Structure formats: C-alpha cells, structure tokens
C-alpha cells in the first residue's frame, strides 16, 4: 500500500507505505523544493516528515472522536542529503489517554540514518471531519 498524504505532506510529496497502530512507514523524495539555499535537505522538511508519520500513527491509536495534535518535536540531523528518497519509520514509545510519544527514524536510500526525532502529541476530542473512524 502506497498512499499519498494531504496538506503539507502532499506539498512535500510524502507517501504512506505502511500504517498500523504499532508502526508507520512513510517516504519523501528529496527534490529542489526540499532544499535550503545551499543545496542540502532543509531540516524543516525532515521535521515535517517526522511529525506527519508520528501523527498518522497517533491517530490510529486514538479512540473514535479523538485526534492527535503535535505538541512538541525535536530532531537531530545526523547526515546531509542532496537528493534521493527518504524513509521515515515511526514507532510509539508511549500511548496514553491524553498524550502519545513517538520515535521517528529517517534514513536515506543507502539505509544511513539522516535524522532521529521524537514527537509528543496531545490527544483531544474533535468534531472535525475524519475524527470518527
């Protein structure tokens, strides 16, 4: 299953490869629109990929009528990238009633880790479309 993502994820060309409550795998190509002025992957693009993967997994763990919103995210950028396909793998560290914490590992096509991130999400009640599973 490869599924495109909406919103910012769509703009950055992210795709969902796997999505379960225990693990989310997403990809994002590195193209000119993902680069900072010096020709390397913009750190914000990595963080957007990390939070998108964590949010997808968190939503799969939310009860009906609840959604997950990013509350805090950190990222360590370990290796620079100029092109290629990135793969983010998000796994839950904590699934609570009102919060979740996810760890996201982002690797390049050579399976070298380029970024590691941790994202905390608030679980809140919502009447937004799509909040009911």
Q: Which residue ranges define each predicted feature?
A:
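Terminal targeting signals and extreme-terminal segments of soluble enzymes
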Residues: 1-133
